[in-house]
Amino acid sequence: MFYTGSFWFIFFILPAIPFCHSWSVNNFLMTGPKAYLIYSSSVAAGAQSGIEECKYQFAWDKWNCPERTLQLSSHSGLRSDLNIHSTGASPAGSGLYDTGPTSPVWSINFNRILFSRLESHFNKTFLSRLQIPFPQGHTVQSATSLSTGFLSPANRETAFVHAISYAGVMYTLTRNCSLGDFDNCGCDDSRNGQLGGQGWLWGGCSDNVGFGETISKQFVDPLETGQDARAAMNLHNNEAGRKAVKSTMKRTCKCHGVSGSCTTQTCWLQLPEFREVGNYLKEKYHKALKVDLFHGAGNSAASRGAIAETFRSISKKEIVHLEDSPDYCLENKTLGLLGTEGRECLKRGKALSKWEKRSCRRLCGDCGLAVKERRADMVSSCNCKFHWCCAVKCEQCRKSVTKYFCVKKEKRGGGIPRKKESKLKKKL
């Protein structure tokens, strides 16, 4: 499988999609729990790849896609909650299975919900063979009693998380389909033999992006049961994520002709590296559109109509949000924000981009913090040599590196900060 891992990661609540729902893709019909079992691991892995890409794209931003603020809540309170179960150790103080305002993104456990909803269809012996891990102290019976008090803000960062997560789901489903992981789909050859443009025909094995789009929609979009502005925003950003995958598809061609003359070409569409999808959506994030609607509205037919009309007028490729972002320089426990104090930044390095080189100014200076230099020793393998037969032996080299961190500005004698002290001197 293209994306796998030692965890289950998913961001929706299964009860929103009835198990009697029928799935029809490429003339292959599935009903009931089988559909979830076949695709759930790809959906989970795709969501995880989206979050990892989010962390990469915002690594040197004030908001760096922190786990505590990734919850994709919506008007129902539990529509889009992210969850992760990992066999590795969780970060200190992460509260992996806590709930409440400061709970991390992974507060709702998909595995418990999956088990509880499948119990009525399969016996427990079969379910135990699936080897879906449970958090300590939780059972199938407790799976339905889930709640959280944290509703993520409808700002551009939440919008990006929706878009990149659902792009990851569609991307992974498409890739795994082309790799033959599903019996009911394969390459998209629907246009093979047709004229694609001057001098080339469709042919080869195109990645089946239509399959990935269809399944991701059927898994995700029905969860948005609300008709308010927040639900409309989430659905719009879901689609923006899927459009990003389609917009970044690459056309690959093969020449045909005598002696490599390339008289004609056959071409097919391939998925790009997921990094390109992330780059595409990061640009959309910077140009995100704010929709001036009250995001709690939606109880009347008139307001629902106004919301629908507003979102129809916006391109599906654009990321949209309803609220302004908070000040990410500052700690905000209610929103699960830690601020930029203590964050590492970059200053020097040949391979650094302009954005990375300016990270200390952005994370520290712009937030009223100082940059502190720290020296650290790193040990790594070096001078590796191949020895017959058959081993590679390396030396352990110690290297001193310089790292930079954002810290509070030092105070001079008397406890007066430097800026305030200079103002005081002027008055005197």
Curated annotation (Swiss-Prot):
GO MF annotations in UniProt: cytokine activity; frizzled binding
Signal sequence residues: 1-22
Pfam family, one: wnt
Record keywords, A-Z: Developmental protein, Disulfide bond, Extracellular matrix, Glycoprotein, Lipoprotein, Secreted, Signal, Wnt signaling pathway
GO BP terms in the entry: canonical Wnt signaling pathway; cell fate commitment; determination of dorsal identity; gastrulation; neuron differentiation; positive regulation of transcription by RNA polymerase II
Tissues/organs with expression: In adults, in brain.
Function text: Ligand for members of the frizzled family of seven transmembrane receptors. Plays a role in the initiation of dorsal axis development. May activate a Nieuwkoop center-like signaling pathway.
InterPro entries the UniProt entry points to: Wnt (IPR005817), Wnt8 (IPR013301), Wnt_C (IPR043158), Wnt_CS (IPR018161)
Lipidation (O-palmitoleoyl serine): S259
Post-translational changes noted in the entry: Palmitoleoylation is required for efficient binding to frizzled receptors. Depalmitoleoylation leads to Wnt signaling pathway inhibition.
Disulfide-linked positions: C54-C65, C177-C185, C187-C205, C253-C267, C255-C262, C329-C367, C345-C360, C364-C406, C382-C397, C384-C394, C389-C390
Entry protein name: Protein Wnt-8b
Keyword Lipoprotein: yes
Primary localization class, coarse: secreted
Subcellular location: Secreted, Extracellular space, Extracellular matrix
Origin species: Xenopus laevis (African clawed frog)
Membership in a protein family: Belongs to the Wnt family.
A single Gene Ontology CC term: extracellular space
Keyword Metal-binding: no
Name of the gene encoding the protein in the UniProt record: wnt8b
Carbohydrate-modified residues: N123, N176, N332
